[in-house]
């Protein structure tokens, strides 16, 4: 048996005990077969992503069964070996509806405008066109995976892609409240567009992480104890470090140099 698939099913069963294992196995097997064939036979395969990586990204968001199936099959439509009619017969109308929404988003040629108003209009267009929020969640998960593949494509293309992600998809992730994707996309885009600044902040934050985590854990415990003492025993308190891009922007707004140690402590 496939260990990756078995682990995924175990994760899904935690929140969706009635999941149809055979249905997901069928979609997974199909996606792996076509993915491996594309990698082997397509000349320009640097930007082909593995569908199961998209699914792995999604699991923490507790997607339903149709969403998982659609995530497995989404990029396979480009192979020309899979058609919506066949997918509907095998997996149902719900999956086809998600895939059609993803195809619409994928077909949009995103143009990076200078005008903030035009950018906002484009973001709204994405939100209007994706009437099912699950479509955007899958699409954002794909963007996270694609950002990892940018090192293997020419720098002018990777910079254009990273700029598009920061201008369009990061705000969408924020509007949907998916802050994990927001921070990942911001930091990956920042690394591509401003590698030197990224390296400085990465080094600086790395020196402070242990001290910062100890402080966050200490304060979290104090707050948790406080709530518990006042009858709120189920309250969970946690903290996190800011993303590199967020630190960069805050320091920029304050006019502070990147190597200003004191400011890093404030994050």
Describe the residue ranges of each PLM region.
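Nucleic-acid processing machinery
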Residues: 1-16, 33-40, 48-60, 79, ...
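Short, mixed-charge amphipathic alpha-helical segments
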Residues: 12-27, 84-94
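Short, well-structured alpha-helical segments
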Residues: 21-32, 48, 96-103, 186
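Conserved structural-core and active-site-/substrate-pathway-adjacent residues in large, well-folded domains
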Residues: 31, 71-74, 99, 142, ...
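Alpha-helical scaffolds flanking conserved acidic
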Residues: 49, 53, 64-73, 94-98, ...
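Hydrophobic or amphipathic alpha-helical targeting/insertion segments
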Residues: 73-107
């Amino acid at each position: 048996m496939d260990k990756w698939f078995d682990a995924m099913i175990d994760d899904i069963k935690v929140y969706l005990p009635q999941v149809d294992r055979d249905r997901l196995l069928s979609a997974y097997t199909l996606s792996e077969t076509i993915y491996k064939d594309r990698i082997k036979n397509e000349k320009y395969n640097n930007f082909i992503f593995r569908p199961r990586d998209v699914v792995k990204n999604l699991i923490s968001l507790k997607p339903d069964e149709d969403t998982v199936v659609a995530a497995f099959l989404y990029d396979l439509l480009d192979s020309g070996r899979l058609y919506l009619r066949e997918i509907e017969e095998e997996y149902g109308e719900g999956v086809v509806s998600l895939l059609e929404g993803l195809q619409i988003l994928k077909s949009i040629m995103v143009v990076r405008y200078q005008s903030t108003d035009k950018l906002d209009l484009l973001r709204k267009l994405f939100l209007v066109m994706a009437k099912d929020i699950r479509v955007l969640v899958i699409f954002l998960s794909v963007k996270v995976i694609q950002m990892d593949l940018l090192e293997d494509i020419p720098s002018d293309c990777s910079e254009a892609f990273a700029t598009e992600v920061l201008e369009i998809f990061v705000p969408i992730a924020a509007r949907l409240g998916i802050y994990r994707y927001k921070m990942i996309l911001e930091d990956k885009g920042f690394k591509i567009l401003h590698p030197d600044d990224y390296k400085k902040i990465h080094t600086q934050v790395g020196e402070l992480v242990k001290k910062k985590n100890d402080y966050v854990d200490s304060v979290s415990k104090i707050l948790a104890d406080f709530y518990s003492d006042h009858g709120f025993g189920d309250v969970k308190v946690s903290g996190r470090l800011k993303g590199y891009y967020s630190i960069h922007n805050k320091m920029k707004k304050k006019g502070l140099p990147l190597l200003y140690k004191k400011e890093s402590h404030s994050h």
